[in-house]
Amino acid sequence: MQKNMDTCPQLTIEVTDDGSATLFVPALDEHYHSVKGALTESQHIFIDMGLNHCTVAHPHILEIGLGTGLNCFLTYLSSKEQNRNIHYTGIERYPLNEETIHQLDYATLIGKGHAKAYYAIHEAEWEKDVHLSDTFTLHKIEGDFTQYNFQGKYDLVYFDAFAPEKQPEMWEQSLFEVLYKVMNPGGILTTYCAKGIVRRMLQTA
């Protein structure tokens, strides 16, 4: 059951250049994904440059900003293709409603017969381990990343917050220090943001 601790901001759906949909937040003047391609961005940043570079056989992954579930879904598909056991934790402050999830229609676009799994990501209970397949376990947290006390240790972090200029509270040095402490030695943090200040914070942490 969702706790609805916050009110989800108004959202509109837009189709990006690769044909996949994303969400636009008018209050922030910001999209959830690149308008050049939501699917393309997620695949490149989080799978190709993140998961596929993680050498841990059975990685524990933490996503900051579960959002549309696209990164989680692509990771699930990779776990099936590679027969690789993955434990996936995702934290989200503003869970999407059912109507929005269906309108995004990622399952039809890229699911290849795994539509049930995509919707299972969003239907999974919060705050407990849910086994979506023999190789993929999901643990969803409904909460505020800036206030949450993580208990696990992670091999790979998907940092998928909005841009620093749109959501500066998510990019504080102290938060990257928290992430560093919950990562296993040799862990990887991947994010779409390549600004110099972000690189320096990661190096300092």
Question: Where are these predicted regions, by residue range?
Answer:
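Glycine-rich SAM-binding Motif I of class I
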Residues: 69-73
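Rossmann-like AdoMet
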Residues: 1-59, 76-110
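Local beta-strand N-terminus motif with an aromatic residue
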Residues: 58, 153-154
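A short glycine-rich, Lys/Arg-flanked "PGG" loop and its adjoining helix->strand segment in the class I
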Residues: 170-185
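Conserved beta-strand signature within the Rossmann-like core of class I S-adenosyl-L-methionine
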Residues: 185-193
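Conserved Class I S-adenosyl-L-methionine
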Residues: 196-205
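A short SAM/SAH-binding and catalytic strip from SAM-dependent methyltransferases
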Residues: 155-170
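S-adenosyl-L-methionine
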Residues: 100-151
